[in-house]
Structure formats: C-alpha cells, structure tokens
Amino acid sequence: VKCRINSSTYRPVISAQLPFRYAVYFCPAPDSNWGLAGAQWLGRCAITGKKDTQPQFSDIDSELFHSITSDPRRYGWHATLKAPFKLVPEHEVGDLLLKMHQLAKSLKPFDLPKLEVSTTGGFLSLRPREVSTPLHAAAAMFVRDLQSFALPLNDAELARRRKAKLTLEQ
C-alpha cells in the first residue's frame, strides 16, 4: 500500500485534555487505504469514531489483541510530527493553528518508502525501511518551526524523557 502525503489531507484536531498539551500528528484520511487499514488494525477510527472488526490471528488470542490495542484505539492511527508540548503563555491556540496550517500547506506531496514493523519505547510502530529525506524534512520543519510555541520542559519532564533513553533521532 502506497502512502501519499500531501497538504490537502491536513485537518487540525484539538483534544481538550487538561492540562492542555498540543502535538502535530499526521493521520491518514479515514477513507484512504492507510486510514481503513489502521481502523481495522485498531478496531476503531479515531477521526470518525466508527468501530471496525479487528483481524484474527492464529498465534494470538483475540481478547489479548483487543486488550493490547486499547490505548492506540483511543488515540488512533497516526504519525507523530511534533511530540506533545504545553503552549507558552505568549501564544494562543489560534496562533498555533495558523502556523500549523501554514506549515502543512507548504509541504510538497511525497511517497513514503516501504515500511517495517519496529518497536519504539515499548510500542509497535511502522517505520521507513530506508531514509526518507522528504519525511525527515517535514518532521524537522514542524519540530523547528513550532518550537517557539512550546513551553520548555521542566526538570521532572526532562528527567522522565532522559530515563526513556531516547535515540538521537528521537
């Protein structure tokens, strides 16, 4: 399945969790091949809320599979472009949304290379098998150009992140 990423698929989604944190995620359109595959894998589309029948595997109990996909089923099939952050007091949500929209519109369409299953911090993820310059450039753009909106991490948050032993790329 080919994934074509372009700015026309951009749609901001705000989650009202307290304390407010914001992040930038790429979520495939619910009716795209990627969106349909993700909804089936997780058993639910986070964008539409529509439930889906999860696949059955001979090597894993269906209740166990349903259980281990419960957290991702809630937040959905996505790719993180900028990790969650708290908004600095100098900016309002509207400023952030405007900047996100401008950045998304500046993206040129690109295809992802083949993906492989990987484990990252205890999570299963799909990662490119080879370096994708446009993907890295898009993610770097969101991280770099939205950093002025992010409140610096406090000591406890820094300690938690350091304990996670993130890779240099992360």
Task: Put a short name on every predicted segment.
Residues 119-131:
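Short, conserved secondary-structure transition motifs
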Residues 134:
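Conserved "landmark" site that anchors the functional core of diverse proteins
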Residues 10-120, 137-170:
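Basic, often amphipathic N-terminal segments
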